[in-house]
Amino acid sequence: MMVQRLGPISPPASQVSTACKQISPSLPRAVNAANLNRPPSDTRSVILQESLVSTTLSLTESQSALSVKQEWSQSYRAFPSLSSSHSSQNGTDLGDLLSLPPGTPVSGNSVSNSLPPYLFGMENSHSPYPSPRHSATRAHSTRSKKRALSLSPLSDGIGIDFNTIIRTSPTSLVAYINGPRASPANLSPQSEVYGHFLGVRGSCIPQSCAVASGQKGILVASGGHTLPGYGEDGTLEYERMQQLEHGGLQPGPVNNMVLQPGLPGQDGQTANMLKTERLEEFPASALDLPSALPLPLPPPQGPPPPYHAHPHLHHPELLPHTQSLSLAQTGLEEDGEMEDSGGKHCCRWIDCSALYDQQEELVRHIEKVHIDQRKGEDFTCFWTGCPRRYKPFNARYKLLIHMRVHSGEKPNKCTFEGCKKAFSRLENLKIHLRSHTGEKPYLCQHPGCQKAFSNSSDRAKHQRTHLDTKPYACQIPGCTKRYTDPSSLRKHVKAHSSREQQARKKLRSSTELHPDLLTDCLAVQPLQPATSPGDAADHTVGHSPGPGPGPGPGAELYSAPIFASNHSTRSGTAAGAGPPPHPVSHPSPGHNVQGSPHNPSSQLPPLTAVDAGAERFAPPTPSPHHISPGRVPAPPSLLQRAQAPHSQQPPGSLLKPYQPETNSSFQPNGIHVHGFYGQLQTFCPPHYPDSQRTVPPSGSCSMVPSFEDCLVPTSMGQAGFDVFHRAFSTHSGITVYDLPSASSSLFGESLRSGPEDPTFLQLSAVDRCPSQLSSVYTEG
């Protein structure tokens, strides 16, 4: 909440002191403009009085500073001296607000001109102004707006935290709600004045309304009972407010506990008279009891009821007849008739609501008045809510027996000792007696069945099982079960529901993907080595991080052309690979050092066609389906151009395992890509039949080496990267994006100490160092 500050409208300190002395000469201490002393109060705390000052002023209508100053100047001259108990609790620029009598308006647009005296800590209830009616004429109330900010001079320089005060004393505003209605001059509506503080919009701001008695009720702080006519919502509101103010309002004297003054009644009584009469009934010792203890005639303690409960206030002489609201509502049913309670039995025949103390009297009344008085052969039940829906009986005795259901008469009582059951029909009693005697006179009539039953209905159910007559069929789709009695059908339906719940649980558990399943799907699976004589070679050769002059004799051969990764950038270390399982079109093997993108001085020759008789299989275009965080596919032709030069082979002959160039003269022109996003580890070729896989390759064919083998670790400038990017993008259609690099030797140094597993494809360096990403290769 924002508090607006006025300009310099405060009078000098001498005027403040003079005004305060004129208002209250008996003040115990002198009032100065800088720091007003706070005399102790025996009845209320300082915080509560501060809240009264601040919240009262914050509810006034906005007006100019001049009008506020003039209004307060007039108020000073009008008030006589008060007792010291009315003295200030807050130092202000214009004196003490609490020196004013309760109920005095503080501005021309004041919306609260009747403050209860107990909130000011008044020990003497016989104040010079016992009623706010004396000062009500100066409160020219208008239709106030919601959340009006205070423009009174007291808001300047006080430094009061309104939020803290309102939270400390949540019911300080509720105490003086109906003030402006204290005289006929102030009957203007005041809706939504305090609603923004109370949390309920306009719930506690009653409008001026006429009451039949002409007298408004009052509230006296005492026990936890409710005045009659307050309504259920009023009781709930009162209990809630009482909990809030349990620690805020101290148990003070009885003299200051009238919260709501009233209009003058028809008999000339005023709220002040009622206050004096009610206070005489409560001694001081009774008020010290907890609120939970019931008092003889205790009106409720706390704030007045909400707005919707005010029109239901009763005359003051009804106060001794207070009773609990729940008791007034109990026993009433929807039709407004009293149920059988306290020995009363009600007749619900149409247009009849007779009450009887004894059940026999009600039965006699139904028979003599409602059945025997019917003319002709009309034996229809007209009981309210009867399920027969006015279907007549064909005999009088049947109607009488039926009426026992409504009246509750059960004349047929069990004669066995200890059994207290009674029945309205004699047949039901006979069936019950068979349960005591064990008699089962109803035998199954189906040949060969010896079952017997105590009643005919059970026998009929059993006989339907023999006749295969099962009228009670299951209505669930897909179920063809039928039953002879409805009870069995109900059990079956319950079993259906339990089975459906179990099925839903199983389906839910099966559809939910476990995190481990997703991890297993994304895991890199090892490639199975091809069955070739080279598999018997030593698997330990070729994995050493140190450089070597040639390929290891035991280089692994895989079933598809792959780019082996050993997680170590080496100068001259070879990763051997076997021939591809199917013919793949490659560029002419006439490439040399000058024909590779490592040397920008020469031009790359175009791709050469494979032999005319050979099947043409173009390398698959990289697609998003082949891209994974650890693998970035690329055409073999591109990688062959980017690799180190190798010896020329005649077309149509198989190439030997790749021999990387280890000449040191080549290294200055080598390219080292920082943080290449995943080494190109595997290439996913299209699936071909096994027959094509066994065909020996024809035409020019070469095995693509590992891409990291051609990335020799060396230093190069930005020009070398530009040349490589241009050559890479021009001939492959793959765009190269440069990103900031975090390391200069990703392949060589960061992963040199990592463990190696010859049976698995190792993930790239990005898997371990994701922050060192420098180049991302995407499709052009």
Curated annotation (Swiss-Prot):
* InterPro entries the record matches: GLI-like, Znf-C2H2_ZIC1-5/GLI1-3-like, Znf_C2H2_sf, Znf_C2H2_type
Show the PROSITE patterns listed in the entry: ZINC_FINGER_C2H2_1, ZINC_FINGER_C2H2_2
Q: Give GO terms for biological process.
A: negative regulation of transcription by RNA polymerase II; positive regulation of transcription by RNA polymerase II; transcription by RNA polymerase II
Biased region (Low complexity) positions are 567-577
Primary localization class, coarse? nucleus
- The biased composition feature labelled Basic and acidic residues covers 497-512
Q: Where are the zinc fingers (C2H2-type)?
A: 345-370, 379-406, 412-436, 442-466, 472-496
Segments carrying motif Bipartite nuclear localization signal: 490-506
Polar residues composition-biased segments: 80-92, 106-115, 593-605
Quote the biased-composition stretches of kind Basic residues, using this chain's numbering: 135-148
Checking Gene3D superfamilies in the record gives: Classic Zinc Finger
Q: Which UniProt keyword terms apply here?
A: Activator, DNA-binding, Metal-binding, Nucleus, Repeat, Repressor, Transcription, Transcription regulation, Zinc, Zinc-finger
What Pfam families does the entry give? zf-C2H2, zf-C2H2_15
Q: In which tissues is it expressed?
A: In the embryo, expressed at high levels in the kidney and testis. In the adult, expressed at high levels in the kidney and uterus and at lower levels in the brain, lung, skeletal muscle and pancreas.
Extract one GO molecular function annotation from the record.
RNA polymerase II transcription regulatory region sequence-specific DNA binding
Q: Where is the composition biased (Pro residues)?
A: 293-308
Query: Where does the record place it?
Result: Nucleus
Region Disordered, as annotated, extends over 80-148, 290-315, 485-512, 527-670
Write down any Gene Ontology CC term. nucleus
What's this chain's function?
Acts both as a repressor and activator of transcription. Binds to the consensus sequence 5'-GACCACCCAC-3'.
The UniProt similarity line reads: Belongs to the GLI C2H2-type zinc-finger protein family.
UniProt protein name: Zinc finger protein GLIS3
Q: Which organism is it from?
A: Mus musculus (Mouse)
